[in-house]
């Protein structure tokens, strides 16, 4: 117990958040690298990202199409989604990412792991979402540590825009959760506020959470935990 306390993070609410000694995806044998640097920031408003991505051949990607569907928006490296796909084989997962090299590597890792319930798609989600899913297709959505785009004139580049919220209200089944995380308080609060402005979303917890209810950190989340930095989390639901 003492070791756990020493490795804990003090949350803004004063509760100690325990963290494991190593990330849960650390043992995944992922061999393929990128071979080159990938830009950390991509402007989603550039013309090259304004064409909707064609949906994948779902029946080729997922072995069991009837399982509930989890959409991870801005999936980054994909390690979080690969790990949760291993732990929850009764769910199907799609990670959407605007940096193509990361998508290609994540799908290569998926193939190494032999997973048939997870796929990664190169797309601008704000352009492609309605072309990928039909109403009621989604059962869970995560938006974890999106690019904060700090400058005010760049806020229109942020992922969570009113139209995205309206689209998710249509595509999510009633009772489905939307999990939001950021290490930037203003970004997390803005995301939550955008969803709560829509009449189809509500906050059953009436405020931020102290811990990640999914139990698997992203790489950015893990870095924040190691540095004892605060993380702002909201678990909202579709009415």
UniProtKB/Swiss-Prot annotation:
Record InterPro entries: SAM-dependent_MTases_sf (IPR029063), tRNA_(Gua-N-7)_MeTrfase_Trmb (IPR003358), tRNA_methyltr_TrmB_bact (IPR055361)
Cell cycle as UniProt keyword: no
A single GO molecular function term of this UniProt record: tRNA (guanine(46)-N7)-methyltransferase activity
The keyword rRNA processing is assigned to this record: no
E.C. number(s) listed in UniProt: 2.1.1.33
Region of interest called Disordered, as start-end residue ranges on this chain: 1-30
Gene Ontology CC: one annotated term: tRNA methyltransferase complex
Primary enzyme class: transferase
Functional pathway: tRNA modification; N(7)-methylguanine-tRNA biosynthesis
Family to which the UniProt record says this protein belongs: Belongs to the class I-like SAM-binding methyltransferase superfamily. TrmB family.
Name of the protein described by the UniProt record: tRNA (guanine-N(7)-)-methyltransferase
Upper lineage: Bacteria, Bacillati, Cyanobacteriota, Cyanophyceae, Synechococcales
């Amino acid at each position: 117990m003492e070791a756990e306390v020493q490795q804990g993070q003090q949350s803004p609410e004063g509760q100690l958040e325990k963290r494991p000694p190593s990330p849960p995806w650390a043992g995944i044998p992922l061999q393929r690298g990128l071979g080159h640097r990938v830009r950390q920031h991509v402007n989603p408003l550039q013309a090259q990202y304004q064409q909707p991505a064609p949906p994948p051949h779902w029946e080729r990607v997922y072995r069991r199409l009837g399982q509930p569907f989890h959409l991870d928006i801005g999936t980054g490296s994909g390690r979080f989604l690969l790990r949760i796909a291993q732990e929850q084989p009764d769910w199907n997962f799609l990670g959407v990412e605007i940096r193509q090299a990361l998508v290609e590597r994540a799908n290569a890792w998926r193939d190494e792991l032999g997973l048939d319930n997870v796929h990664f798609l190169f797309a601008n989600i704000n352009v492609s979402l309605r072309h990928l899913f039909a109403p009621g297709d989604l059962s869970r959505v995560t938006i974890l540590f999106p690019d904060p785009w700090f400058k005010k004139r760049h806020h229109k580049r942020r992922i969570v825009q009113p139209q995205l919220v309206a689209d998710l209200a249509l595509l999510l089944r009633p009772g489905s959760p939307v999990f939001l995380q950021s290490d930037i308080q203003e970004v997390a609060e803005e995301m939550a506020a955008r969803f709560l402005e829509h009449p189809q979303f509500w906050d059953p917890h009436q405020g931020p959470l102290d811990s990640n209810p999914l139990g698997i950190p992203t790489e950015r989340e893990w870095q924040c935990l190691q540095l004892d930095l605060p993380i702002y989390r909201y678990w909202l639901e579709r009415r």
